[in-house]
Regions:
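Long, highly charged low-complexity segments enriched in Glu/Asp and Lys/Arg with interspersed Ser/Thr
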Residues: 128-138
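Long, contiguous N-terminal structural blocks used for assembly/anchoring
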Residues: 1-77
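Residue-identity detector for threonine
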Residues: 13, 32, 50-52, 97, ...
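Amphipathic protein-protein interaction modules
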Residues: 57-130
Length: 138
């Protein structure tokens, strides 16, 4: 890795919010390349483009602004909230509700979080022409 690449990665990801870090780690973990191998085999957080990191921060901030009180009430921290936000958004089968029993207040809150995350729609992680990772929506 070049010094420029190292500095870009360090400066770009060392300042990530906990939520955006969890969000991008989940995105990297579940995405696959054209051969079906997980992207985290060959890429790390420092490989996301600057624009993608900024967009992830904005999406996470927007989600947190609307939902932080809810996820903190049920004991979910910022990192896990970001992780679950990505997975629920993607329709992966993982849910904020997974840790709660039916009929509980926590389950009702978690269902609201799922609904909020799904509103963002699916997104896909793909390498761009510069070898960085971008997230495409729609």
């Amino acid at each position: 890795m070049s010094l420029l690449g190292f500095l870009k990665g360090f400066l770009g990801t060392s300042r990530l919010s906990e939520m955006a870090r969890g969000y991008l780690e989940a995105a990297l973990w579940v995405a696959t390349d054209e051969d079906g191998y997980p992207l985290d085999r060959d890429y790390s957080l420092s490989d996301f483009s600057t624009e993608t990191v900024a967009k992830a921060e904005r999406d996470c901030q927007e989600f947190a602004s609307a939902n932080a009180e809810l996820y903190s009430r049920i004991g979910i921290g910022e990192d896990k909230a970001g992780h679950l936000f990505w997975l629920v958004r993607m329709g992966s089968g993982v849910s904020f509700t997974d840790d709660f029993k039916t009929g509980t207040v926590e389950m009702q809150i978690a269902k609201k979080l799922d609904t909020s995350a799904r509103k963002y729609g699916e997104a896909h992680v793909m390498p761009n022409d510069e070898g960085e990772l971008d997230i495409f929506t729609g």
